[in-house]
Amino acid sequence: ADVVIAVVGGSSARDFKTTYKETGAAIADKSQISDMECGEGFDRATLSLLGKQLELLESLKSTRKPLIVVYIEGRPLNKNWAAEHADALLTAYYPGQEGGDAIADVLFGDYNPAGRLPVSVPRSEGQIPVYYNKKAPKCHDYVEMSASPLYSFGYGLSYSTFEYSNLKVTQQAPLHFEISFDVENTGKYDGEEV
């Protein structure tokens, strides 16, 4: 193959073999571990990929072929390794029954992606939980890493580029503002700016 596409992450599929405590937490022993890693009753202490998925990615990267990593997830997973080593990274969340077709359309260039992250993706578990109304201290990082998210709320890429101009802000009332601007697609491909 010219390119390696690795799909990693987890599942929220109910396998109906899992039993639950009164609190809703899943009961599983080593012989009967569900592949479900997200959803009601499946809290996790880590954002890491489960099982040997990271080892798989490292092995695939060692082939020296371009590596595209697609994350299927219901919560932000640790993407630090992929952000540093993969040639492309796509977060698909749980895309539903047509998700495979939609992912293929993006990867093969039949659709120009326009989606943006609905959450910030942390670099580490130490950055969560995130309170969106909490102001971050100025110039305060962790000892071993930046305090900024790996990918911020609203981040996303496209095969197109866009230019903004003619920004106008008009105050309509004490707490009511109207904002307008022009958006121009300056890229080679048709696209949507979200």
Please report, for each region that a protein language model flagged, where it lies by residue.
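C-terminal non-catalytic regions of proteins with extracellular/luminal or membrane-system context
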Residues: 1-194
